[in-house]
């Protein structure tokens, strides 16, 4: 392996093909047909409590009770909507990556690369990302509390969402981070260790479905964002192979555990940062070890289904056809037509359905109401039930 890719020496990036890991079991324990990407809208009372807690006006115990109440409501919402697998709504986080920043010492929360998000009307907002400024040190588990709380509240299948090493590569800046890590590789090596340990801990606690969130893969499609990587000491062409290697190292080999990879193009208050079809990054489908790919496909920004030809025959594609950014409710008949169109490239039995992304990747949430969110989750569940029936248990080869 070239020295530039020697971040984790036990993972080999293999050639493409129908399945580039033919000696590794890639059979899901259950093929869930209706899936939720992760985040749900935070209720107003939780946002107010978060502000009070930050101002020192609310105790840890009082704030935790309020978070718990919001999670209980998220659980009930998803189960009543008919979703086959649920999350805690990510309501304990200030953003989808907040579990990393709050649990690991070494980041300046808002001191990093400011990414412009925009919408079809040209309206923009800027999100200031974290930046690593000192050596990483894990203060507490990243996701364990989230999972164990849901596990204790319901017997319904639940998954946990985690940031990818690839996503967190954007938190390195060759100027601001140099005092902590001379190279991005040194930073990422520590990060991979932390994320890999968290995966092992989640599995020890009984989690059987772990989703890795990696919207930065699609950033590699955008010329402006690629240049942003270069300016911060990160070669975007090298980063694709390195990211695949890192994400494979994080999830490791755990028979009986389902791993999903979510790809989107940014999701912040109904705005996005990138566009383009999946064609240039289909290596992610072929060379990673994920069982499920949760892909944004709600509008023309995502391109057509043709790149799905590159998905190995033993993986599941979760089609994100229902927008979490816009309030208008999609037509069930139109969803079924799009599922049929996708089945020309991936067999119907290897497809599933979800919203295109979370409803609140940041604490502010998207421009949809709680009623919109519920209707869209119900639409996903009902459409999946009508197309596929109930989720299918499969034998898992160990």
Regions found by a protein language model. Give the residues of each.
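Extreme N-terminal basic, low-complexity initiation segments
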Residues: 2-10
């Amino acid at each position: 392996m070239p020295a530039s890719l020697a971040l984790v020496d036990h993972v080999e990036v293999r050639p493409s093909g129908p399945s580039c890991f033919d000696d590794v079991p890639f059979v899901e324990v259950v093929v869930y047909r209706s899936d939720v990407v992760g985040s749900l809208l935070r209720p107003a009372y939780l946002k107010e409590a978060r502000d009070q807690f930050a101002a020192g006006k609310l105790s840890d115990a009082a704030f935790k009770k309020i978070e718990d109440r919001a999670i209980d409501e998220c659980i009930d919402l998803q189960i009543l909507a008919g979703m086959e697998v649920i999350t805690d709504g990510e309501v304990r986080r200030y953003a989808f990556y907040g579990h990393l920043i709050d649990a690991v010492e070494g980041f300046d929360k808002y001191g990093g690369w400011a990414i412009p998000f925009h919408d079809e009307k040209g309206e923009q907002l800027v999100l200031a990302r974290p930046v690593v400024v000192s050596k990483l040190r894990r203060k507490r588990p990243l996701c364990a509390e989230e999972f164990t709380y849901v596990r204790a509240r319901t017997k319904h299948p639940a998954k946990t969402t985690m940031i990818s090493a690839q996503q967190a590569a954007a938190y390195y800046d060759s100027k601001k981070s140099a005092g902590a890590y001379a190279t991005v590789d040194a930073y990422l090596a520590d990060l991979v260790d932390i994320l890999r340990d968290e995966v092992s801990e989640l599995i020890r606690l009984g989690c059987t479905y772990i989703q890795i969130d990696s919207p930065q893969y699609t950033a590699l499609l955008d010329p402006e964002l690629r240049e942003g990587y270069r300016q911060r000491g990160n070669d975007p062409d090298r980063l694709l192979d390195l990211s695949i290697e890192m994400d494979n190292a994080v999830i490791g080999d755990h028979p009986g555990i389902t791993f999903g990879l979510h790809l989107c193009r940014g999701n912040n208050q109904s705005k996005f940062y990138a566009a383009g079809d999946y064609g240039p990054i289909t290596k992610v489908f072929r060379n990673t070890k994920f069982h499920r790919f949760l892909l944004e496909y709600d509008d023309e920004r995502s391109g057509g289904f043709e790149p799905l030809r590159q998905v190995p025959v033993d993986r599941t594609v979760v089609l994100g056809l229902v927008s979490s950014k816009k309030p208008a409710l999609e037509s069930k008949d139109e969803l079924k037509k799009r599922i049929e169109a996708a089945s020309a490239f991936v067999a119907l039995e290897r497809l599933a359905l979800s919203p295109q992304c979370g409803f609140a990747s940041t604490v502010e949430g998207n421009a949809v109401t709680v009623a919109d969110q519920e209707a869209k989750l119900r639409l996903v569940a009902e459409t999946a039930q009508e197309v596929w029936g109930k989720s299918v248990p499969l034998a898992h080869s160990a």
